[in-house]
């Protein structure tokens, strides 16, 4: 059995070795078929179980059922299995997969595309009993799943990490679970080793990330998952590919690009530092004792590094490297948290607080990480020189201005905290593609970027930008959050290998000179910037080196102008000194225009200018300035938003096209013919006339309506029309008895017998029964009576008129009174009860109120004044007031309770319906005198 192979066991019995012949013996069929349905999301994947390298069948009871972490979709994983049959029951068969030679198991999530290498601790320092292994594994687990962290925890000393090419894919993108043993349906951890300690190489943690020592099982069960471990499962937007570390090559493969460092000395340096880190981690665990979680392990590392804060300069290079990689582990933890899309902001804030406490040591860590990978052969062999390079960080007598500058640069623009807040808001358009990979481009840079010097920052960023300028696809969602360190924050330039070496040499000289400058304690920081003659490039380019060799990283704002913190005053002083010694504003504008032109054309290669001033002035690595970072950032954001919108629209278009395939409908052209053309039937050809036979009648109608002056509607008259005759005949009216009266505009059609009918007036006195014709004639005669005839009384006038006889038989009409047999006068005005009492005077009519009658007859009397009319109206109003029924008054004989009286009083009063006459005076208003008389 290979010691580097981790056994992988299936959760369902796969086919036996003898193939399909024994399929009938399996009464439950093939459980592996459920892999296409849905692997259980709860199942057996969330428990911690031991992970053994030796075959399980050697020490596991045969009745144990060992499920695999996922139902596999890969047919290759079912190629070799060993069956173990229970001696008691032949029908129960558990099949265990045999390991694949030369390959380590890889847990692959289909959604996350994350490959996690299971490394063995065969060559761990001080054996399995050393607690340093636990600490190292914890540190390694923080770095798993995030290629942004190019931390030594990802590499092994004297070992090659080999990755399995065959990938086991999950159906629903669940997290890679660990191996476990089921006993009576429960997942348990076997803390006792049946075969001895040597047989148990490691224990998989709850997330299946990295192996832990067997002796750390209690720690693993009691520990709270670290944020890096929590959010590593949500790295569904990242594509992780393998990291290969060989003796002559260190390859960091992000999505489609690779950053390769081929020098042996760099790998040796990484191996050496990794060994130092393991020793330091072991010592930190000894000092801390038993820990309860990975976060506490990190805290112990932080405390050790903090205690060694300013005494580092007294130590040699190995100790310094040890502290640097201790801090780089903490650093890598923050970058591993970026895998979570939803909680990235909260985690960044938390990491920012941690980094602010360790800002000095963070900068040192980044510098040493950078130097350990990228320095030349000369620098590797000179530990004293590297110790001198970091004197400014280690010096306990750092100038307060320098400390403020260092703290500000770390908290605002440097390290993980600044990159989380400053640069993530301004993402380069070329990298703003998907949520797909949070830090593919920054996978090799973030630990080296924080706190780096100006020249080395340029070298790192420009080399990374050489490989990662165009790696995101247009169809990506939210882009690479880690790319902002490599591409969007820095100048988009390309640095060749020769420039890198030259920059590395410049770095050593710069740090040495900076140390000399800071050692005196009198030379201000601003003078370090005097080397940039010929351009004011630090306005919006990478900041220059300061006394603490810790320049601001360039943000997407106005760089030094927008830098917050105590170092603003120093920056402004530097700006003033440089303005005096260097070129004018006009030169700055010209250079800005020139660089803007080159920026628009293509990626501009990096230009290194070494300007030597006075002997005391250090060399500075100047980067050509471009247009204002604000303008560049805004342009990038606008273009990136446009590109993202275009990509999303393209995706939606493809989705709609797939869901709703377009159906080609031929366009039918219809000729719209004008009405005039249709009416000209004589000009139409015969075929057209035959083609429209059904519309012939409609065309005839339009022909009749052509001349609006001769339209039928204008010539139509109701009188004498066909419809009018039909109506009269249906009503039984003879047209000969119709009299047209009135003017021509408003003719009035009345019956012939009603020619003299006027306004209805009350009858004077029913002396004798009169026919309707006589009544109508009398009313008409009265209406046309001249005023001089009114001198006589109405009775005399009525008697002097001869009755008018109407010929009912010749008119064709029937007398309604005769037909009904009525012989009495129909009172059309008032329908009050007829009073038969003898008290009725000759001036009143039975059934009519005397006041109303008096009011009516007063109009007919000739008087010099209207006194009679007003008096009659006053008497009428007084009568109405006496018999007013506006308010309900219950009768005296009614015996009602108070509540009933209140209810009845609230009801509407309808007693007015008992009145004889409903009078609504609208024109007559009594005078005050008559009203007083009526009241009196």
Curated annotation (Swiss-Prot):
Q: Name one Pfam family in it.
A: Clathrin_bdg
Q: Where in the cell is it found?
A: Cytoplasm; Cytoplasm, Perinuclear region; Cytoplasmic vesicle, Clathrin-coated vesicle
The gene that this protein is the product of is AFTPH
- Name of the protein: Aftiphilin
Q: Which GO terms describe its biological process?
A: intracellular transport; protein transport
Q: Where does this chain carry the motif WXXF motif 2?
A: 432-435
Highest taxon, organism lineage:
Eukaryota
Residues of the region (Interaction with AP1G1, AP1G2, GGA1 and GGA3) are 1-523
Question: Which residues does the record list as Phosphothreonine (modified residue)?
Answer: 617
Keywords associated with the record: Cytoplasm, Cytoplasmic vesicle, Phosphoprotein, Protein transport, Repeat, Transport
Q: Where is this region: Clathrin-binding?
A: 825-829
Q: Where is this motif: WXXF motif 1?
A: 28-31
Q: Which organism is it from?
A: Homo sapiens (Human)
Q: Where is this motif: WXXF motif 4?
A: 478-481
Leader sequence range is none
Complex formation: Self-associates. Interacts with GGA1 (via GAE domain). Interacts with GGA3 (via GAE domain), AP1G1 (via GAE domain) and AP1G2 (via GAE domain). Component of the aftiphilin/p200/gamma-synergin complex, at least composed of AFTPH/aftiphilin, HEATR5B/p200a and SYNRG/gamma-synergin, which plays a role in the AP1G1/AP-1-mediated protein trafficking from early to recycling endosomes. Within the complex interacts with HEATR5B/p200a and SYNRG/gamma-synergin; the interactions are direct.
Residues spanned by motif CLTCL1/Clathrin-binding: 716-718
Segment Disordered: which positions? 1-36, 197-216, 374-409, 589-637
Motif extent (WXXF motif 3 (partial)): 436-438
Residues that the record marks as modified (Phosphoserine) are 151, 395, 518
The biased composition feature labelled Polar residues covers 617-628
GO CC term, one of those recorded: nucleoplasm
- Record text about domains: The WXXF motifs mediate binding of accessory proteins to the ear-domain of AP-1, GGAs and AP-2 through hydrophobic interactions. Selective binding to the GAE domains of AP-1 or to the alpha-ear domain of AP-2 is tuned by the acidic context surrounding the motif and the properties of the second residue of the motif itself.
